[in-house]
Amino acid sequence: MVGAMCACIPSYFGGSLLVAEGTPDFPDTGRFWRLLQDHKVTYLGVAPTLIRGLMRYGDAEVEGFDLSSLRVTVSGGEAWTEAPWRWFFEHICKNKLPFLNIVGGTEVGGCNFTGTVLHPLRPGSFGMGGLGVGADIVDDAGKPVAAGQVGELVLRNPNIGFTKSLWRDDERYLDSY
């Protein structure tokens, strides 16, 4: 899902997509940051693994590059731990750029949870449920719990990206899935 969005959405809005071959730290440890700087990247999508790998080279490595073209950052692919999240927010987002953490995937119909520019940022968290999913936290009996209480995460509605049927064969879809 993310790959398809990355490939299609920039051109739909008149933008460009930067795809780099190879590893982000070869032939030198500044390669990734130099690509962002030289191409004046405005929208950056990362996975926590990438940031953990790059932050090991130290703060000075990234501080030597001009990343002022960045306007928004997005992450996905895995959960964040606090140290890389804080490092990324401080050194790349400069404690002010929107940093949208997204959970979803092709197999779940798209975006289930996302950060927003309207909600405060907290390490590893999401601002809200994806459009229409009806996210809720419930107890063992399936009843909603009060804010701040521990419970189980449920999605009460199907994701808007879920397949509804097979082409001209609703019955086969219902029988199969």
Report the location of each language-model feature.
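Hydrophobic alpha-helical segments, especially N-terminal targeting/anchoring helices
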Residues: V138-D139
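Alpha-helix/helix-capping structural signal
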Residues: T49-R52, E78, I160-G161
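Conserved ATP/PPi-binding loop(s) of AMP-dependent carboxylate-activating enzymes
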Residues: G129-G132, K143-S176
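Short acidic, glycine/serine/threonine-rich loops at helix termini
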Residues: A4-C8, G30, P84-R86, C111-G115, ...
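Gly/Ser/Thr-rich phosphate-binding loop
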Residues: Y12-G15, W33, V41-V46, M55-P123, ...
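Nucleotide phosphate-binding site architecture
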Residues: D25, I51-R52, T163, L174
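Conserved AMP-binding/adenylation subdomain of ANL enzymes
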Residues: V2-T42, Y57
